[in-house]
Regions:
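N-terminal entry segment of metal-dependent catalytic domains or homologous docking segments
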Residues: 128-180, 185, 191-195, 278-281
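Active-site-proximal, acidic helix/loop segment immediately C-terminal to a metal-coordinating Asp/Glu
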Residues: 179-203, 266-274, 285, 289-335
Length: 337
């Protein structure tokens, strides 16, 4: 027996076995991720097709009057449709030969089209494609969203937090993602999760479906484990209904009637498991309320002081940008004590 040769052969055999085992595990993970991705896409397409299948109840009289108005301006529409959706909201879509409009012109068109339809319209969304311009008029929502954000990284580090805030035609969306770990890899994961979630929401995906697709994207991003928390709130600006979705995120806060309360349960981040273990909740917001998303770094001393500060800010009527700045500055001061 030659011990050295035997050990070398055993090492080679074990290395080959381990390599094959890792390849098998990686292939299995890829199959699971792709299956989850296709399943999420199928569910998303089902939801989108259902939405497209409910275009609303047509209102031919108003459609004719709106078409006549545009014709009187010297731009007879190629198509004109005024519809009433299931929630009683009036929408108008006018397709014209490709035309450029200034902001004052769009505001004037919205005012006159709204007068014809007996509704208060926002300036229309303008879509241009293949020599045509489509103007999409929607009713002004009952609520208006005002955003604010503030953040800071620990000394000598890069923050893994990423924020997206925007309004879609019917809802205000706010996203906060915190990449797992520290440094630039965490920042990359957080930014990827926030940006991809925002793009999916703008395309009409629900929070749950967006989370499933982002989960797959993080899982397939690299051979190393990638993960991020997902904190999302979507507020219907017509009804005030707010849908909160959290996956691994720190508790948020709602300020209603001047009283602050934490919201959110314990869950796992996205990107570390084959599925998404998120928590959903529906609440109602009114004018003057605050919805606050925070990362775990703000809660090192617990949520009590945050709730008290939010109630003070609500009593003073502070704008969201000021509220966010006060919370971050106070958290930093408390951490340095």
């Amino acid at each position: 027996i030659r011990p050295a040769a035997l050990c070398a052969a055993a090492n080679r055999s074990f290395a080959l076995y381990r390599s094959r085992k890792e390849a098998h595990v990686h292939a299995e993970a890829m199959r699971t991720a792709l299956t989850e991705q296709y399943s999420a896409m199928a569910d998303a397409l089902s939801v989108l097709s259902e939405q497209l299948g409910r275009p609303g109840n047509p209102e031919p009289y108003k459609s004719g009057r709106v078409a006549a108005f545009f014709a009187s301006l010297g731009t007879p529409p190629l198509e004109c449709a005024v519809t009433l959706d299931d929630l009683g909201r009036t929408r108008a879509a006018v397709t014209l030969p490709r035309t450029r409009f200034s902001s004052p012109e769009l505001a004037a068109l919205a005012q006159e089209t709204g007068r014809i339809c007996r509704r208060d319209f926002d300036p229309p969304q303008v879509l241009s494609c293949k020599g045509m311009t489509t103007l999409l008029f929607c009713e002004k929502p009952a609520l208006r969203a005002v955003f604010g954000t503030a953040g800071t990284a620990a000394k000598g580090t890069v923050s893994g937090d990423a924020v997206q805030q925007f309004c879609s035609p019917a809802a205000a969306q706010m996203i906060l993602c915190d990449g797992m770990g520290t440094g630039r890899p965490a920042a990359v994961d957080g930014s990827l999760a926030a940006e991809l979630t925002a793009r999916l929401l703008k395309a009409g995906f629900t929070a749950e479906l967006a989370a499933r697709l982002v989960n797959v994207a993080l899982a397939l991003k690299s051979d190393e484990e990638s993960g991020a928390t997902l904190d999302l709130i979507s507020v219907d600006l017509y009804t005030g209904t707010a849908r909160i979705f959290k996956a691994g995120a720190a508790p948020g806060f709602l300020v209603h009637g001047g009283r602050a309360r934490p919201v959110g349960d314990i869950s796992l981040p996205i990107g570390i498991l084959g599925g998404v273990n998120g928590q959903s909740r529906v609440v109602h917001l009114a004018a003057g309320d605050y919805a606050v998303l925070v990362s775990d770094g703000l809660l090192v001393d617990g949520p009590g002081w945050v709730a008290k500060q939010l109630e003070l800010s609500a009593a003073a009527g502070d704008p969201p940008e000021k509220v966010a700045r006060i919370l971050v500055e106070t958290a930093r001061a408390r951490a340095e004590q």
